[in-house]
């Protein structure tokens, strides 16, 4: 009988990538097949995120929901991975003794051995060490699951922003060797992948060693990936403005496969707050890089991350952020109210701004961003857009779905053979979270 694996993933795209690798490594080692139903699973994994407020309590709340299932099915193994696992370690076992395995982001490749150790010794096991880049050397060959794929090119972060736990949960920055990344991209392209998404906590700090001993930056890596037969689009996330180099800006002029969209977290428009955050740049320096980029790609769309209500944020600080949002014209943003993360410097800063004020500021910011997004979506009506068809629409199996270069979802009527192809559609309607399009006549016939 085939045994099954259920994975619940919280957090960022890096976690989504890590979860896919957990599934691959356990399929290769133990033949575990993924299921979307937790009640069908023989192994249950929770891949955690520590970015948002009360992350630890949310983990134990989820584990509490699985406790009864485990009691009724004692053969089921439960594992906790990700950043909360890295922070809490064996304390997870103390609070939830029914958990069998605790592992960190850098030790997911050891899951088969941890699983075997748990079964052999009949006691919980914990491995939250930081074995640098070792995990990539022990993962199975990548398996494409559609025309787009995520490729992790580096791990960790060395910026130590005052509000962020990533350096403590994922370790210092370390880049995968250049040729290892290229080999994975070649393998994925041979399996039908047409769009590569390069991942890292601070992806534009990539410094991969080449076979000749030279060091490749992200811009050079992008050039090489663009030359792979079949790869028609490249994206990368998440970037840090401090490391957004001239070489990377020039890549937008030199590599047409580089998507016409950039996610660049600014966090605040106030120099005072940016300094408290230890971001390492000013609002003017951020705007200068955007101006240079727009000289090369005038119509590039930008998204960002913004924290509202950072300790000590005044009305003027918030207005500086709103002014920057207006000037840059961000298309979308992941914006949220600051919450202190244990062990970070910002957690010790005095914070006397009432929560009600923080909520008001967040609402004002999000209203502006929604207005920006709606205005841009409406401006696309009637335009021809090149999209990569990724599959069927979530709402209707009678429609296809894909993404534009600027990362907008487009749903349209069309034949299934178009899945995995780049095609042109005309945008016919703008909805709050997606666009509707019409397939152009020349795309209707099979190739």
Curated annotation (Swiss-Prot):
Coiled coil: none annotated. Its cofactor is [4Fe-4S] cluster. It comes from the Bacteria. SUPFAM superfamilies: Radical SAM enzymes (SSF102114). Signal peptide: none annotated. CDD domains: Radical_SAM. It is an enzyme of class 2 (transferase). Residues 143-375 form the Radical SAM core domain. SMART domains: Elp3. [4Fe-4S] cluster 2 binds at residues 157, 161, 164. InterPro entries: Elp3/MiaA/NifB-like_rSAM, Methylthiotransferase, Methylthiotransferase_CS, Methylthiotransferase_N, Methylthiotransferase_N_sf, MiaB_methiolase, rSAM, rSAM_horseshoe. PANTHER family: CDK5 REGULATORY SUBUNIT-ASSOCIATED PROTEIN 1, MITOCHONDRIAL TRNA METHYLTHIOTRANSFERASE CDK5RAP1. Belongs to the methylthiotransferase family. MiaB subfamily. This is tRNA-2-methylthio-N(6)-dimethylallyladenosine synthase. It comes from Legionella pneumophila subsp. pneumophila (strain Philadelphia 1 / ATCC 33152 / DSM 7513).
